[in-house]
């Protein structure tokens, strides 16, 4: 029996050192050396201060800003600790009522509802933390943002186009617009205007 315990303890110590210490240390050094921005959370700085992350959505509700997908992390919006699925299923009888309420909130905010509302403006994402919207959702908001900022809609649409990211490697995912980056670009453009 004693002859079995010693090899087990040695194996335990070796595996703990390799998987618990060496591997995480090597991956941390590799990440910091090769992907420093991503390894540190893809933080976005403005004037030397961190204003957010390109990976986590932020609440924007002023008419002069583009709005992202709804957060599903109540009661604190965009709380990464509360991330998780939140949308009702397509057969849930509460889904139409929830979507109608969100459309009414858009109307109350002065949004022109004569065009179809992009689905990502009235539903939350799977995580409830999405930092990006579709180009259609951004285009839908151009008039409201331009009016609130006293800018030409074409100038705002150009900023949307400049902040639209295509499919990864040309085939993965869909084109998307990072709301935080777009709103920072809007602030910079208006300050320069």
Swiss-Prot record:
MF terms (GO), sorted A to Z: ATP binding; P-type potassium transmembrane transporter activity
Top-level taxonomic group: Bacteria
Compartments (UniProt record): Cell inner membrane
Pfam families hit by this protein: KdpC (PF02669)
InterPro entries: KdpC
Membrane association type: Single-pass membrane protein
Signal peptide: none
A GO cellular component annotation in the UniProt record: plasma membrane
Residue ranges of the TM segments: 7-27
Record's keyword terms, sorted: ATP-binding, Cell inner membrane, Cell membrane, Ion transport, Membrane, Nucleotide-binding, Potassium, Potassium transport, Transmembrane, Transmembrane helix, Transport
Function: Part of the high-affinity ATP-driven potassium transport (or Kdp) system, which catalyzes the hydrolysis of ATP coupled with the electrogenic transport of potassium into the cytoplasm. This subunit acts as a catalytic chaperone that increases the ATP-binding affinity of the ATP-hydrolyzing subunit KdpB by the formation of a transient KdpB/KdpC/ATP ternary complex.
Complex formation: The system is composed of three essential subunits: KdpA, KdpB and KdpC.
Protein family (similarity comment): Belongs to the KdpC family.
Protein name, UniProt field: Potassium-transporting ATPase KdpC subunit
Organism of this sequence: Burkholderia cenocepacia (strain ATCC BAA-245 / DSM 16553 / LMG 16656 / NCTC 13227 / J2315 / CF5610)
